[in-house]
Amino acid sequence: MKAIRIAIDGPASSGKSTVAKIIAKNLGYTYLDTGAMYRSATYIALKNGYHKEDVNLILQELAERPISFKKAADGSQLVFLGDQDVTMAIRQNDVTNNVSWVSALPEIREELVKQQRRIARTGAIIMDGRDIGTVVLPDAELKIFLIASVEERAQRRYQENIEKGIATDFDTLKTEIAARDYKDSHRQVSPLKAADDAIIFDTTGITISAVVQFIQEKAEKIIDMA
């Protein structure tokens, strides 16, 4: 049975991470949250008051405090910068609102893409982000691009934030998500777009379990054919 690589891309709050984690568990695959890597770089920038021209300082701290992932007792994924658990810190609104400019820095993308490709070499991995199918893993055996309305994505993020205890205004979230869509799809380096051979799936009004089933069936078919 061949171990394949699955790329799931899409805009903010399209369900990428939730779906990817479930499928990874079902298939016994490794899940790599690339968004958490860019959020970690953003956290470094904000914590130190760095700006675009300080990219080398961000890279230096990433080298000194490498990003790693560990499993919590409940099976959830923890994100570390060096020995610091930043799982909750990188999900705060200030990081969310600044991750677009940090992730658009060519030097940051080059370094993190290098790390992502190294992790994916052995296969049996599911990776989600915005440029996995186009840049990170252009030869992935299965590429999915998830979309959903801004209204629905704002509702999902609102619910997530409430559950995490993050103060959130729904209308502000809608505005922020629409603004991030524009930034992500218009940046010069690795803009958000579907790969030519990606399956585009609109998840508006679709349950998580239905999305998981759709993607997992596609994956299992490819695995069985390999």
Curated annotation (Swiss-Prot):
Subcellular location: Cytoplasm
SUPFAM superfamilies: P-loop containing nucleoside triphosphate hydrolases
Residues the record lists as binding ATP: G10, P11, A12, S13, S14, G15, K16, S17, T18
Superkingdom of this protein's organism: Bacteria
InterPro entries listed in its UniProt record: Cytidylate_kin, Cytidylate_kinase_dom, P-loop_NTPase
One GO cellular component, as annotated: cytosol
Record keywords: ATP-binding, Cytoplasm, Kinase, Nucleotide-binding, Transferase
Reactions catalysed according to its record: CMP + ATP = CDP + ADP; dCMP + ATP = dCDP + ADP
Pfam families linked: Cytidylate_kin (PF02224)
Stated family: Belongs to the cytidylate kinase family. Type 1 subfamily.
Protein name: Cytidylate kinase
Organism expressing this protein natively: Streptococcus equi subsp. zooepidemicus (strain MGCS10565)
Gene behind this protein: cmk
